[in-house]
Amino acid sequence: MNSFHLKIVTPDGICYDGNAQSVTVRAITGYLGILAGHIDITTPLGEGEARVIIDGETCTAHCSHGLLSVQGGEVTLLPAVFRWTK
């Protein structure tokens, strides 16, 4: 599976800065999945579980409010809260 650069930044600092194969987050309109090559998009985040696939392993986190941005193949999450649960 192809990968992309993912950066997750909260008001407390950087939670992740590296490659990922997939990220799924709750936007305000429902869950949104991002893979490599996704079109550019900026959307507000809702509150819910986030799933990130890193090196083939699925990691989960609580993600709450903020923004998701996909620009030029790079994905940036700017949530108010992001806590890894697995």
Describe each region flagged by the PLM.
Residues H5-K86:
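Compact, glycine-rich, soluble single-domain proteins
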